Each structure stands twice: as structure tokens, then as C-alpha cells.
């Protein structure tokens, strides 16, 4: 029986049309997908677009367009790129699709039912373009605005109610898993980097937003939308028909 091999590109953020960097990532993934097929593996190759969030909402507003209309137009250019490059992908997923929404909300319910999610408040410096929060020592004053020292992007002070994932509880289980599965992260230099990061201490992760509406609604509180950490990342499961997992009878071996 052939082993299963699952390979993905990052799902691309369609705030603008694709450029050479998107082609570069896609071609590398396609190379490995084709090589593994030749090597006898049952390959599933995924690419797609991450279409939710404040950045998309604001980009659409600037053009006086509905966010879905904006995403439909830009996402098509990414899907067209897969044909231009003659990629061998099995699927092109969009996080605005119903199949993805079902997966995200199912995963949310599992986490909430297992007491891995709680409601609290978050405050900090937020960059819309980076979709990231920064600590006080990571921002500086420049030309009258606060900016991220690492990216140079303008940041805004944000205070809001948010649901949090108890990531801090997973520090030891993750380290144990990495120790028992030494080839899980490759190359070794990256494995060491990840282990060092986890050992430095994990903080609970903000996984919802109330300050914008363009996203998958939290199933138990429609005042919140699911944030990127649980929305976009779940695409790697939703393409495999999670929670049904109908694509194959067993999980990917690699």
C-alpha cells in the first residue's frame, strides 16, 4: 500500500494580486509533490487563499467593494496562477467557503467543550498589515506614529474583549512530543529553533475579534469572529474534509 504524503503551500493572503514570491513558494511545493508521486507516494497537494480579517475588510472598503466581492476577484488571480504555472495541486481552498466554515466552527466547539478556550480582555499595539500584536519594547515612535521595530508597520493601540486559547498548557506536551518524534520538524536547525521558542514560555493566544466583522462567526457568540490562528490554519484540515476526513481512510504518513 502506498504511503500518504500531504504537502501544502502557505495559503496566500489576497489583499493584492500575486507576485513572484507566490510563484516561488508554489513551484517549490509542486516540485516536491511531483517527486513524491514518482517515488510511489499517494500525494495530496493543497494551495489556496486566506480571505478573512481586518486587512481584507479595509482593502475592500478603500475600493468601495463588499469584502466577498473583493476576495472573489483577487482569489481568482491566485487560482489562475496555479494554471499558469501548471501546478499539480489536488485542491484550491478558500477560507470563505462553507466547507471551511464548518471545519473551523467544529474545531472551536471541540476546544471550548474541552475547556481550552476562555473569555477575557486583550490590550496591546496591533498592526493591521502584519496582523500581529507587539509588546511595548517592540514598537518605537517614527514621524509622529508608533511603528513596529521589526517590520516598520504602523501600529494602533487596541483594547478589546477576546476569547483565548490555553496555549500555555501545551508547553510540556509539545516538548515531550518533539522529543519522542525527532523527525517531526526538519531541518534540525528549525527543530532546535522551535524547541527553544517553546521552552522560553508559551502565552495564551487571542483567537477572536470584535473590532471587525469579516470572518467566521464564533459558534457560541456571534459578537466575535474567529481570528487567524484558528481560522486560516484550519484550512489544512478543512481541505481534507475535516471533521469527516473522507479523502482517505487513514491519516497522512508524512
Model-inferred region functions:
Residues 2-119:
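N-terminal Rossmann-like or analogous alpha/beta NTP/dinucleotide-binding catalytic cores
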Residues 2-47, 99-103, 147-249:
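Structured secondary-structure scaffolds
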Residues 56, 60, 127, 134, ...:
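Short clusters of hydrophobic/aromatic residues that line enzyme substrate/ligand-binding pockets
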Residues 57-58, 104-105, 130-132, 138-140, ...:
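Short acidic, glycine/serine/threonine-rich loops at helix termini
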Residues 62, 108, 137-138, 204:
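Alpha-helix boundary/capping detector
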Residues 116-163:
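Cys/His-rich short segments
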Residues 250-254:
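A short, hydrophobic C-terminal helix/tail in secreted or cell-surface proteins
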